[in-house]
UniProtKB/Swiss-Prot annotation:
Gene field: SYT4
Renumbered residue ranges of the record's region Phospholipid binding: 229-531
One GO BP annotation of this record: lipid transport
Pfam families hit by this protein: C2 (PF00168), SMP_LBD (PF17047)
Protein family per UniProt: Belongs to the synaptotagmin family.
InterPro entries: C2_dom, C2_domain_sf, SMP_LBD, Synaptotagmin_plant, Synaptotagmin_SMP
Entry cofactors: Ca(2+)
Binding site for Ca(2+) 2: D459, D514, D516, D521
Species of the source: Arabidopsis thaliana
The protein's role, per its UniProt record: May be involved in membrane trafficking.
Protein name, per record: Synaptotagmin-4
Entries under PROSITE patterns matching the protein: C2, SMP
Keyword list, A-Z: Calcium, Lipid transport, Lipid-binding, Membrane, Metal-binding, Repeat, Transmembrane, Transmembrane helix, Transport
GO CC terms: cytoplasm; endomembrane system; membrane
Compartments where located: Membrane
């Protein structure tokens, strides 16, 4: 009996083990098949698929998704042919770049040419390529190549000063990183299947180089190093940086539609600067500003010099052509005028044009920095105030622009004015650069000084006896409010009317003072142009007081236009 029971138990256990093993094998096979399917699915996934499926915090910090594909194969082939590219391209680049440098040669130099130019033995590395479907359109292909070059070229500049001194200057330690854009357009049914190639530097991520006088020191001649470096950077910035592009016809045809064309006009008023860094050992700086979108000599505007001031007021208006509002920017540089010597840079600032709303005035204060590319300057160099108004081409009639000559026309003159006058895109440059009639806008400006709040305490009792002086700078007319005693939050609600003879070039100043029996102390001020009130007709706003530790001033402005005249010049 015991034997039979043991036999039964043995058979049952063996059968159970066989069933369990078969079950396990089936489950394992199913899991392996599922895992193989999952791995195959992951293998077919693109980078975009993985970014959609998995959250951003799932990836470690060292994982970077690039929109560009690697080009190791191209770099290997480029290294092989680079010696031949160096021989073939050096002279071609030299002859092409020299005329560009001549356009940007600074006034302190008589000439700037190459005496030697070779690309060296180190080939550039293409780190990525991408096709821009959104930019290509149905009739073209747009490609972007990311390039890095730490080369060893042999570049020697022959620099001649106005005094006739010739200096051989070597450009060394060149490092460049950027993105080039290639446009194959239009697509045609004739080999090589595109009519022209356009190329441009879409993004300049980094450009470093050093200058050295062969057999001497560049610092021995003040200003030369900065002038040459600025010339090289400006030439690169304006000659091939997007939206500027070079067009190479591949097949015969008219490719004028690929050329850079104006898309609008930018009105810029350089109002003032404050708290500028002092560059003079004795006295104060003599600041002036230059403004440009493209740093061509005929497209760079310069204000007058304000002597011995760290808080200059210019209030000067300039006009600029805009070719690509999405990528271009306005640059302002403030210098200290040194007379016969070279000017010293106080600071610079930039405004992207894509931040501007067409037809709406943008009043902005910009912090000045030493280098616009590095942006690591912590030193206080001051601020500059700009007033910007962008008008797209073809929409001038629907947007109010007091700087436009049509703004000063009477209703009858607008009816009689021919439609075709300066309306085409090809006439935009002529319209902006030509000397046109000055626009004179007359009217009545009503200024209501409403109130102030949070004024700094200037009296011994912790109060202030505040009043406001209102001044129109050009007409030199003044008015002042009553004194509100013992208050840091005075309320005036007083209105003053001013007859303005030239509103576009006038400036409104409101100065808050503390009244004392033995004198008066200035608390702070607000300076503004009349452009906004001319466009909006009427507005009320709180303004921060410049020169004060704290405090704001509430002002209500109203503009009533009068007879508008045109002054022939």
């Amino acid at each position: 009996m015991g034997f039979l029971f043991g036999l039964f138990i043995g058979i049952a256990v063996s059968f159970g083990l066989v069933v369990a093993f078969a079950r396990y094998s089936s489950v394992r096979s199913t899991r392996r098949a599922d895992l193989a399917k999952t791995i195959a699915a992951f293998a077919r996934m693109t980078v975009q698929d993985s970014r959609k499926l998995l959250p951003g915090d799932f990836y470690p910090s060292w994982v970077v998704f690039s929109q560009r594909q690697k080009l190791n194969w191209l770099n290997l082939e480029l290294e092989k042919i680079w010696p031949y590219v160096n021989e073939a391209a050096s002279e071609l680049i030299k002859s092409s770049v020299e005329p560009v440098l001549e356009q940007y040669t600074p006034a302190m130099l008589a000439s700037l040419k190459f005496s030697k130019f070779t690309l060296g033995t180190v080939a550039p590395q293409f780190t990525g390529v991408s096709i821009l479907e959104s930019e290509s359109g149905p009739n073209g292909i747009t490609m972007e190549l990311e390039m890095q070059w730490d080369g060893n070229p042999k570049i020697v500049l022959d620099v001649k000063t106005l005094l006739g001194v010739s200096l051989p200057i070597e450009v060394k330690n060149i490092g460049f990183t950027g993105v080039f854009r290639l446009i194959f357009k239009p697509l045609v049914d004739e080999f090589p299947c595109f009519g022209a190639l356009s190329y441009s530097l879409r993004e300049k991520k980094g450009l470093d180089f050093t200058l050295k006088v062969i057999g001497g020191e560049l610092t021995s001649i003040p200003g030369i190093s900065d002038a040459i470096e600025e010339t090289i950077r400006d030439a690169i910035e304006d000659s091939i940086t997007w939206p500027v592009r070079k067009i190479i016809p591949i097949l015969p045809g008219d490719y004028s539609d690929l050329e850079l064309k104006p898309v609008g006009k930018l009105d810029v008023k350089v109002v003032q600067a404050k708290d500028l860094a002092n560059k003079d050992m004795i006295g104060k700086s003599d600041p002036y500003a230059i403004v440009f979108i493209r740093p061509l000599p005929d497209r760079t505007k310069k204000t007058k010099t304000i002597s011995n001031s760290l808080n200059p007021i210019w209030n000067e208006h300039f006009e600029f052509i805009v070719e690509d509002v999405s990528t271009q920017h306005l640059t302002v540089r403030v210098f200290d005028d040194e007379g016969v010597g070279s000017s010293q840079l106080i600071g610079a600032a930039q405004v992207p044009l894509n931040e501007l709303v067409p037809g709406k005035v943008k009043d902005i204060w910009l912090k000045l920095v030493k280098d616009l590319e590095i942006q690591r300057d912590t030193k206080n160099r001051g601020q500059v105030q700009l007033e910007l108004l962008y008008c797209p081409l073809g929409k001038e009639g629907g947007l109010k622009n007091p700087f436009n000559p049509d703004y000063s026309l009477t209703i009858l003159e607008k009816v009689l004015k021919p439609e075709s006058e300066d309306s085409d895109a090809t006439d935009m440059k002529k319209l902006v650069t030509s000397k046109k009639k000055d626009v004179i806008v007359r009217g009545v400006l009503s200024v209501t000084v409403v109130a102030a709040e949070d004024l700094p305490a200037v009296d011994f009792m912790g109060k202030a006896d505040a009043f406001v002086v209102i001044t129109l700078k050009k007409s030199e007319t003044k008015s002042k409010t009553r004194v509100v005693p013992d208050s840091l939050n005075p309320v005036w609600n007083q209105t003053f009317d001013f007859v303005v003879e030239d509103a576009l070039h006038d400036l409104l100043t409101l100065e808050v003072w503390d009244h004392d029996k033995f004198g008066k102390d200035k608390i702070g001020r607000v300076i503004m142009t009349l452009t906004r009130v001319m466009l909006e007709g009427e507005f009320q706003e709180w303004f921060e007081l410049d020169g004060a530790k704290s405090g704001k001033l509430c002002v209500h402005l109203k503009w009533t236009p009068r007879l508008k005249l045109r002054d022939a010049s």
